[in-house]
């Protein structure tokens, strides 16, 4: 915020006017496109100038549960799509970007800050932050993205009729299709290891889906529940000799520490299949899933309707991404002692080889 220096003696009128102009100009700041770490600090940055047709500057609070490539891609996709449609950062939109650093208490504090600031919209990236936002306010429109099952998370009444002040986009995975990739890589695979955060609804849903899908495919799931990212490597090591492959779902805690899983997998030559493409780019062998950048863009399209007064969250069905794509990592396969089938390479939308 600007601080005003009160004049204690008479100055020429022209000098006084010029001083005010300089103070105003110096007070304008740009909002960073990277979220602030941990608990919220300060206020949203002031726009650098420019207004929409109605002369309004919008305040949008953005909070993600933790920083990792998939969630970051959703955030950047949202901001870019908003700008393409006339809602530009530092012109007519102020973004307050925050990261809860994996802590629900931080997520609640951040949501309370957004409420106190009178934000026009909250973008909650991942299930815990969406739950924190809804717990905090029933008035400010909330859009979520990267939420696997918003009904199970008690965010919406139904996918078709959310009700209340919350809606958004889901990143529900085609879990069965992803597990089929394991069989394609290793036809004799019978046991699949899954590490997940026991405190995240999103993760529990995916583990249950994996169990059901594995049963259909003649495999079993060996699960290891964790409560901290520091436990990921130990959990992976505990499965060595017991599993034929690892499956890493879109669990925010595990994905943020996927390097720990990959270290064990590479040393023990255990293939890793992931729930999203950024994990493949980090070193998993393959995934069949969504593009988080495009999911963010899709969420922005919903935000545009809300901010323009064309729709309300209660009446906007939760949306999902229609197109899935196969992404494979040849280098990762080599490190884990796996030869990628030519059929898989031929149908892949993207092949990473460096």
Regions flagged by a language model, labelled:
Residues 94-116, 224-239:
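Structural motif
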Residues 100-157, 248-266, 270, 275:
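Beta-alpha junction/loop-to-helix N-cap segments that form part of ligand/metal-binding clefts
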Residues 150-189, 291-311:
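Hydrophobic alpha-helical segments within soluble ligand-binding/sensing domains
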Residues 47, 55-85, 96-105, 199-203, ...:
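Extracytoplasmic "Venus flytrap"
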Residues 308-354:
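Hinge/cleft segment of the Venus flytrap/periplasmic-binding protein
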Residues 60, 78, 167-215, 318-332:
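An alpha-beta-alpha
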Residues 21-25:
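C-terminal motif of bacterial Sec signal peptides marking the signal peptidase cleavage site
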Residues 27-30:
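Bacterial signal peptide processing site
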